[in-house]
A protein has these predicted regions:
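Transition segment at domain starts
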Residues: 20, 26-75, 108-115, 119
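Hydrophobic membrane-insertion alpha-helices, especially the h-region
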Residues: 7-26
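Beta-strand signatures of extracellular beta-sandwich domains
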Residues: 92-94
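Short edge beta-strand/loop segments characteristic of extracellular beta-sandwich folds
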Residues: 78-84
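Short coil-to-beta strand junction motifs in C2/discoidin
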Residues: 86-89
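Solvent-exposed coil/turn segments that connect beta secondary-structure elements
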Residues: 84, 96-99, 132
Length: 134
């Protein structure tokens, strides 16, 4: 084998390895996500909701990898979401005193927010509101 062939083989194998790693990072959260709550479970938990809001995909901060579409309800015991989220690792749910549309808004307001909990599913979720959160 010539040096040129060896270099091409090494380069193509490295490209395939990097591509496999990137695809694995994207797919792993989808494969390891727990089952999402059913629509009836979400409806039961959201029956005492005090507030309702929506996630829209057309916000300034949304892109192919960061979006959500659906209805959020906020109650004393649960915050529920019926809809879909972009797959991704380590989603956290925060309550903010102001509207947040972009990552810059989030970073600016993060110190004033209350972290409620982790979101582990990409379709429908229910998160317990911790004691002491009003």
């Amino acid at each position: 084998m010539s040096i040129r062939t060896i270099v091409i083989l090494i380069a193509t194998h490295c490209i395939v390895g990097v591509l496999g790693f990137v695809v694995g990072i994207y797919v792993l959260p989808i494969l390891t996500a727990p089952p999402a709550p059913s629509e009836s479970e979400i409806k039961a938990m959201s029956s005492q909701a005090m507030y309702t809001a929506s996630f829209r995909r057309d916000l300034k901060g949304s892109d192919t990898f960061h979006w959500g579409e659906g209805t959020v309800t906020i109650g004393k015991e649960f915050i529920t979401f019926m809809g879909k989220l972009a797959p991704g690792p380590d989603y956290k749910l925060y309550l903010s005193p102001e509207y947040v549309e972009t990552e810059d808004d989030f970073n600016r307001l993060k110190a004033t927010m209350v972290r409620i909990g982790d979101v582990k599913t990409f379709e429908n979720f229910a998160v317990n509101v911790p004691a002491g959160v009003d």
